[in-house]
């Protein structure tokens, strides 16, 4: 049995808790204090779109019995990691060309490292959070926590039988708070759960576990319900400018603050419901789950970045970017964003792909993920219309005689391929006939 994970409350010791101010962490904090632990509360400001007053959260923690409570501003680091993911195309989950932008894994990478670093400053070496044993976050936080503090111990009230026996459900937790003098009113429970940060929102569980339940039960928190025809959404022309792989301007306005840049991108994309997707994915433990995702700013930057990418880089570079991005996306999802194999892939794309991405893309956004690209401008474009123009051009880069020579060279590999197909045919792997997998070959 691992001695890193504590299954019983460490009485008399400092215990850090990632405190959201919600029912679960409020009840857990008060319960830990009453049972003899010394709880310290840490709240990450991730720019959550559904959080109104961050400064009130540490005050709540102190009222529930925290020895100390701190608000850690993680927004700049989160924005930087979001840009890194855009630069590397670190997204491995998509359906029908619509992408999930790994916004929750990015948030966990930042939260897991920055909160544990803050705990180390307070000499707090035991950490608890609200992740359940069935999800991805329990492993992500475990990895990032131990990477930041090798002496860290993990205590999760939701893995403690005593806590579960006494406060195993939302009703029991709310009654516990009321019995201890806190005027707690349970909110109306939604048909799904939501987790969010500045980069995106995740809606999952409960009714959304049923695949016959559609996206239309979700109330977006970063955009609009574009599927509702009664919601008026006017087309909007948007320009996005990148410099050396970094988004710097929106509609001609330059942003020196990367957090404000993302906020504005979210507002622009959110007006259209851009970046919403419905995905079935494999969790870290290989069981499948379903989620509805929002990421309007990430989607806007991704579209513009990849438009410039395809106009600037050659085919092999683009292919390697996509292959590395798929692998890096999986590593990010698994909580390995700072592992050596991930850093190697990140550095490669950020150095050799992103640095060349300078330019501006103009788009028209409509409803949901419906958009058109109107213009692409970059000093680094290798796209030159006259190279392949169907019109007659002066000083053409090649002529018909050049193409004849190029095609003649193809005789070498066409002959090799034809001979190889003959070998397969003799071996019975290919059959002749009208329904054959390849056209009939001359038997001579």
Swiss-Prot record:
EC id: 6.3.4.5
Record: residues binding ATP: 18-26, 44, 130, 132, 137, 195
Biological process according to GO: argininosuccinate metabolic process; L-arginine biosynthetic process; urea cycle
Recorded GO MF terms: argininosuccinate synthase activity; ATP binding; protein homodimerization activity
Binding site for L-aspartate: 132, 136-137
This protein's UniProt keywords: Amino-acid biosynthesis, Arginine biosynthesis, ATP-binding, Cytoplasm, Ligase, Nucleotide-binding
Entry GO terms, CC: cytoplasm
Cited Gene3D superfamilies: 1.10.287.400, Argininosuccinate synthetase, chain A, domain 2, HUPs
Pathway the protein takes part in: Amino-acid biosynthesis; L-arginine biosynthesis; L-arginine from L-ornithine and carbamoyl phosphate: step 2/3
Compartmental location: Cytoplasm
HAMAP family: Arg_succ_synth_type2
Database matches in NCBIfam families: argG, PRK05370.1
Family the UniProt entry places it in: Belongs to the argininosuccinate synthase family. Type 2 subfamily.
Name of the protein described by the UniProt record: Argininosuccinate synthase
Organism taxonomic ancestry: Bacteria, Pseudomonadati, Pseudomonadota, Gammaproteobacteria, Pasteurellales
Gene name per UniProt: argG
């Amino acid at each position: 049995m691992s001695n890193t994970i504590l299954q019983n409350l460490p009485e008399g010791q400092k215990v850090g808790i990632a405190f959201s101010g919600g029912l679960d962490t409020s009840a857990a904090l008060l319960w830990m204090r009453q049972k003899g632990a010394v709880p310290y509360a840490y709240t990450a400001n991730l720019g959550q779109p559904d959080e109104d007053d961050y400064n009130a959260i540490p005050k709540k923690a102190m009222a529930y019995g925290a020895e100390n409570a701190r608000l850690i501003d993680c927004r700049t680091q989160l924005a930087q990691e979001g840009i890194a993911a855009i630069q590397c195309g670190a997204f491995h989950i998509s359906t029908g060309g619509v992408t999930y932008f790994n916004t929750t894994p990015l948030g966990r990478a930042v939260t897991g490292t920055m909160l544990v670093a803050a705990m180390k400053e307070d000499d707090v070496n035991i950490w608890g959070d609200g992740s359940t044993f069935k999800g991805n976050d329990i492993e992500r936080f475990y990895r990032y926590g131990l990477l930041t503090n090798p002496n860290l111990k993990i205590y999760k009230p939701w893995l403690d039988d005593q806590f579960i026996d006494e406060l195993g459900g939302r009703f029991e937790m709310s009654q516990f708070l009321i019995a201890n003098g806190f005027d707690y009113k349970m909110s109306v429970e939604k048909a799904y759960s939501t987790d969010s940060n500045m980069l995106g929102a995740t809606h999952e569980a409960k009714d959304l576990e049923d695949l016959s339940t559609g996206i239309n039960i979700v109330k977006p928190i970063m955009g609009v319900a574009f599927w509702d025809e009664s919601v008026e959404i006017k087309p909007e022309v948007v320009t996005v400018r990148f410099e050396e792989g970094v988004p710097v301007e929106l509609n001609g306005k330059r942003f020196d603050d990367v957090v404000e840049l993302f906020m504005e991108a979210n507002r622009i994309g959110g007006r259209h419901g851009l970046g919403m997707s419905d995905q079935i994915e494999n969790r870290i433990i290989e069981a499948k789950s379903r989620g509805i995702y929002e990421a309007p700013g990430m989607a806007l930057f991704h579209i513009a970045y990849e438009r410039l990418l395809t106009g600037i880089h050659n085919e092999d570079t683009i292919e390697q970017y996509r292959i590395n991005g798929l692998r890096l996306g999986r590593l990010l999802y698994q909580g390995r964003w700072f592992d050596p194999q991930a850093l190697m892939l990140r550095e490669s794309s950020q150095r050799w792909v992103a640095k060349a991405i300078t330019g501006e893309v103009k788009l028209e956004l409509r409803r949901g993920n419906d958009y058109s690209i109107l213009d692409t401008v970059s000093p680094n474009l290798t796209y030159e219309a006259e190279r392949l123009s169907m019109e007659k051009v002066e000083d053409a880069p090649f002529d018909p005689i050049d193409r004849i020579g190029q095609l003649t060279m193809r005789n070498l590999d066409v002959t090799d391929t034809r001979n190889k197909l003959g070998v397969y045919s003799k071996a019975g792997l290919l059959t002749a006939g009208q329904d054959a997998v390849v056209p009939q070959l001359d038997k001579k």
